[in-house]
Amino acid sequence: MAELVCDALATLTRNTYGNNDESAKFCRMFRAMIRDSGLYSNIENWRAAFYRDRLPKRMSHSTVSIQLDNLEREVLKIRAEGFCQGYTRKERTLNAFDLGDDGKGNTIIKPTTHLSSIILQNSYNSAFKLPKIPDGLLEKTRCELEEEKKNNDVLKQKIKELENTISQLENFENEAKASEFVLEHLKFTNESLRIQRDEAQICLVGLCNKFGLQCEIDNSIRVTESDKKGKRKGRKNRRTEVSFGAPGHNLTDQINALSDVE
């Protein structure tokens, strides 16, 4: 990959400033600079990590075939253009090698591309063969990927259903909290009304005692004249009765212990 960067810069330099000694010197200085600074090795390491560790995107068989065909056409086109500029097969092959040191002071040839590594293996090992994909492995892997894709779709659907369930439960929780708040408010209001009712009944009993009236509190409240008053002549002995209240209104135990209210 670093060599491709150098080649691209060399091509741009020659096309811009001409194919002369100055352009060649500039390209050599650039290559020496990135080697000395470590940028060359960093680019190679990134390239190796990309091709070894990256996860390929999901593609159909036809898409892979089309991309391979396009890649082959581009490579052939680049080779043809290189041949017209004097960059023959020999030049391309030798450019993929570099001189290095084995650590013992011996000069060795170092391949810089995967293809050059294969060429070097073929040079001294006539029995060298590239490992092939085991029979049926590709089909098996494709089936496993399809199965995993189905499982993934099922899990996505279940996750979506769980999210909807959680959302509904959150809504139920909010409604329950609101209902609980309303219930507490109603309890407080009911207790306040009960206290006011009891106080009103107490006051009524006190007033009845003060004015000599009888007050009967059961399911309703009845106020009548006292039996101690004398009968009026010429009239029937009738007791004026005033009833009010609603069923269920019972006076508390405090009323039974009341004395006359002054």
From Swiss-Prot:
The keyword Ribonucleoprotein does not apply. InterPro entries: Rotavirus_NSP3. Its main location: host cell. Residues 138-179 form a coiled coil. Signal peptide: none annotated. GO terms for cellular component: host cell cytoplasm. Residues 226-249 are annotated as: Disordered. CDD domains: NSP3_rotavirus. This is Non-structural protein 3.
